[in-house]
């Protein structure tokens, strides 16, 4: 849904950073989808400069991809604390244990702090719309929705600092239109 550029849809990749917002249990959450490839580094750096946390989504069968390294290195260097989402855990051949271990090894190789290495893990099936804190949970234990993911975001991403009564200030970073 967020990749609405014709080239992005054709190639199945994210080129331009996108954002959307959701409200979960009374909290406004801004979600930014960044490109993963080093060729789009400017977009990645611009987007990461505006966020308070990072959710790293890794396919349960494929594991970390080369582009995962690029974005993760940038996020860790900014001191962002990752939340790992192992997606497509219901896919045949899924290897969630491998993905968690590979992500830990990647974070360590990229110089993550001890605090960044102590990351929460959420297991999910994005296409089927559910998430869980339990690997290998089946049926009702999965939960009917993305509650586990959103609750993890609320628990682990720092709340925005600032005075809500202060005059509005904003920096325009991109303009886009979709019909």
Residue ranges and their predicted role:
Residues 41, 65, 100, 146-150, ...:
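Hydrophobic face of alpha-helices
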Residues 1-58, 62-64, 71-72, 102, ...:
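P-loop NTPase switch module centered on the Walker A-proximal segment
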Residues 42-44, 66-69, 93-98, 127, ...:
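Short acidic, glycine/serine/threonine-rich loops at helix termini
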């Amino acid at each position: 849904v967020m990749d609405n550029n014709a080239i992005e849809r054709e190639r199945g990749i994210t080129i331009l950073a996108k954002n959307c917002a959701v409200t979960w249990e009374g909290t406004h959450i801004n979600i930014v989808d960044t490109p993963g490839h080093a060729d789009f580094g400017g977009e990645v750096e611009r987007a990461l400069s505006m966020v308070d946390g990072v959710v790293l989504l890794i396919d349960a069968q494929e594991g970390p991809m080369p582009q995962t390294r690029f974005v993760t290195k940038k996020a860790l260097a900014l001191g962002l604390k990752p939340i790992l989402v192992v997606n497509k855990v219901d896919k045949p051949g899924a290897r969630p244990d491998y993905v968690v271990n590979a992500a830990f090894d990647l974070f360590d190789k990229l110089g993550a702090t001890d605090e960044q290495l102590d990351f929460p893990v959420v297991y999910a099936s994005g296409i089927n719309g559910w998430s869980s804190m339990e690997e290998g949970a089946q049926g009702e234990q999965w939960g009917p929705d993305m509650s586990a993911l959103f609750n993890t975001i609320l628990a682990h991403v720092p709340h925005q600092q600032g005075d809500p009564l202060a005059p509005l200030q904003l920096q325009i970073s991109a303009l886009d239109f979709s019909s």
